[in-house]
Amino acid sequence: MYEWLNALPKAELHLHLEGTLEPELLFALAERNRIALPWNDVETLRKAYAFNNLQEFLDLYYAGADVLRSEQDFYDLTWAYLQKCKAQNVVHVEPFFDPQTHTDRGIPFEVVLAGIRAALRDGEKQLGIRHGLILSFLRHLSEEEAQKTLDQALPFRDAFVAVGLDSSEVGHPPRKFQRVFDRARSEGFLTVAHAGEEGPPEYIWEALDLLKVERIDHGVRAFEDERLMRRLIDEQIPLTVCPLSNTKLCVFDDMSQHTILDMLERGVKVTVNSDDPAYFGGYVTENFHALQQSLGMTEEQARRLAQNSLDARLVK
């Protein structure tokens, strides 16, 4: 069934470009930029990819991102991901990038953006993959820092379709960023936000009511709140679910416990995505395949999940 799933036309709506940094590319960029790494080789780094929670993953993720320095580095990162998409018949992507991860270490905003945009444009021309780029604020930093990032983004407003919110969830509720999201909407941006991954269902309510998001990224803990489930179903609010990420970060102990197919059958507009595939062991097709292997997902369910991803695009 893997080949059939691979050939299914699909969109990816929850993908962090920095999370596609495969160990081989990470080492190549470190060499290009003369950066000493704490790992001796690719295999040693792969062994470090054992996380018990979101924070342990984020610590490694931010350390890895340090090799990204030049416009060419960001181009190469994005282009490598788009080639994976082409191989898996992902026809539309709406990736996140985290400018603060780079500007906080002295990389100019415009350098980061130029490399990513050039690769996305080439992906559309050469690979036929359409896109919409999402600028994501880091929630472990202050709202003031997010406002500064929005200031940096405004001269390039035509580069983005939306703003988002990611990084350490617990202790950083969506309400912390209500003003910057209000401002982003007034500037013409759509909004999305990570909520209900490690954080409680209340964070999903806040993302909907205070940040006024078009989509919820993750959202799996909505299953704990029946009133919230009814709202998601009634309003057909998409959830960008990331099964392999959820098991790798111990949101679910095992894929057999995942609720995505239960939510699908209840009528929630769930989609399948890879989140940070270099770190979590699989791109979109591998996430579909894991659901088939562990939960017995049928072809009909896979078709619905793929169609949901196409329907839930911000860029039609």
UniProtKB/Swiss-Prot annotation:
Enzyme class, first EC level, given as a word: hydrolase
Enzyme Commission number(s): 3.5.4.2
Residues that, per the record, bind Zn(2+): 14, 16, 194, 275
Site (Important for catalytic activity): 218
Any single GO BP term: hypoxanthine salvage
Keywords from the UniProt entry: Hydrolase, Metal-binding, Nucleotide metabolism, Zinc
Matching InterPro entries: A_deaminase_dom, ADE, Ado/ade_deaminase, Metal_Hydrolase
Cofactor binding, per record: Binds 1 zinc ion per subunit.
Any one GO MF annotation of this record: zinc ion binding
Residues holding substrate: 276
One GO cellular component term noted in the UniProt record for this chain: cytosol
Cofactor(s) required, per the database record: Zn(2+)
Active site residues of this protein: 197
Reaction catalysis annotation: adenine + H2O + H(+) = hypoxanthine + NH4(+)
One matching Pfam family: A_deaminase
Gene3D superfamilies hit by this protein: Metal-dependent hydrolases (3.20.20.140)
Function text: Catalyzes the hydrolytic deamination of adenine to hypoxanthine. Plays an important role in the purine salvage pathway and in nitrogen catabolism.
UniProt-listed HAMAP family: Adenine_deaminase
Entry similarity comment: Belongs to the metallo-dependent hydrolases superfamily. Adenosine and AMP deaminases family. Adenine deaminase type 2 subfamily.
UniProt protein name: Adenine deaminase
